[in-house]
């Protein structure tokens, strides 16, 4: 999760987020090389005493500055398109969770079970226990199994919301009257935090998201207990 004075991304917990981190490094290297080249040209132009005001055009230069940007854009676009298709692909999900945004909390429904649903509210600061995080903890976590394809259906009851978990590389808009979907695989056990990422009113900052990834047998025990309490 995020920590104070952090300059980079959160640690990846899904294959999609790992791909996004690699793409970020790839694009950043291209931007760094372009910036270095431009600064060198500016410095060389400002410091040289050689001038030629009689050159009105140059076919060679025009070809170069047309082809080079096209090649650079292709180098950025191809891996970007690959990740976009990867993020949109949903193959045989083992579990489907319907997520609804409300002012100002989230509700979760496990559609593969008859009656497994709950609301998830932020824990107030005065009720936190040592080790819990302010404005990030909830009274009920979204519990899912590790290494299993998970499909999340996202919508909203009232206004626009956005279900986002940075460590998983997910940000899906919750639109009233529309059902969006995304899929992911959590590659390691852990607790992953997110927040509503669409301004939705006075308490927009107080509707956190907590995803807990556990081994399959632990998930089965948790779901059995939740069904017994329902």
UniProtKB/Swiss-Prot annotation:
It comes from Tetraodon nigroviridis (Spotted green pufferfish). Belongs to the cytochrome c oxidase subunit 2 family. Component of the cytochrome c oxidase (complex IV, CIV), a multisubunit enzyme composed of 14 subunits. The complex is composed of a catalytic core of 3 subunits MT-CO1, MT-CO2 and MT-CO3, encoded in the mitochondrial DNA, and 11 supernumerary subunits COX4I, COX5A, COX5B, COX6A, COX6B, COX6C, COX7A, COX7B, COX7C, COX8 and NDUFA4, which are encoded in the nuclear genome. Residues 46-59 are mitochondrial matrix. Cu cation A2 binds at residues 196, 198, 200, 204. Residues 1-14, 88-230 are mitochondrial intermembrane. This is Cytochrome c oxidase subunit 2. Its EC number is 7.1.1.9. Component of the cytochrome c oxidase, the last enzyme in the mitochondrial electron transport chain which drives oxidative phosphorylation. The respiratory chain contains 3 multisubunit complexes succinate dehydrogenase (complex II, CII), ubiquinol-cytochrome c oxidoreductase (cytochrome b-c1 complex, complex III, CIII) and cytochrome c oxidase (complex IV, CIV), that cooperate to transfer electrons derived from NADH and succinate to molecular oxygen, creating an electrochemical gradient over the inner membrane that drives transmembrane transport and the ATP synthase. Its cofactor is Cu cation. It catalyses: 4 Fe(II)-[cytochrome c] + O2 + 8 H(+)(in) = 4 Fe(III)-[cytochrome c] + 2 H2O + 4 H(+)(out). GO terms for cellular component: mitochondrial inner membrane; respiratory chain complex IV. Cu cation A1 binds at residues 161, 196, 200, 207.
């Amino acid at each position: 999760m995020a920590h104070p004075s952090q300059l980079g991304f959160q640690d990846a917990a899904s294959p999609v987020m790992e791909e996004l981190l690699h793409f970020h490094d790839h694009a950043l290297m291209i931007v760094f090389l372009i910036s270095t080249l431009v600064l060198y040209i500016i410095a060389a132009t400002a410091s040289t005493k050689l001038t030629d005001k009689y050159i009105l055009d140059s076919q060679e230069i025009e070809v170069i500055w047309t082809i080079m940007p096209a090649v650079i854009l292709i180098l950025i676009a191809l891996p970007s398109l690959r990740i976009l298709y990867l993020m949109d692909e949903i193959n045989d999900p083992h579990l489907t969770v319907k997520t609804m945004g409300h002012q100002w909390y989230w509700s979760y429904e496990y559609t593969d079970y008859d009656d497994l649903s709950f609301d998830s509210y932020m824990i107030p600061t005065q009720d936190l226990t040592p080790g819990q995080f302010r404005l990030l903890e909830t009274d009920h976590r979204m519990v899912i199994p590790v290494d299993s394809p998970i499909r999340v259906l996202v919508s909203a009851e009232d206004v626009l919301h956005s279900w986002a978990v940075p460590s998983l590389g997910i940000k899906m808009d919750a639109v009233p009257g529309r059902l969006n979907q995304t899929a992911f695989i959590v590659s390691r056990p852990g607790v992953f935090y997110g927040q509503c990422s669409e301004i939705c009113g006075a308490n927009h900052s107080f509707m956190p998201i907590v995803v807990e990834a556990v081994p399959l047998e632990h998930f089965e025990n948790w779901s059995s207990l939740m069904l017994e309490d329902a």
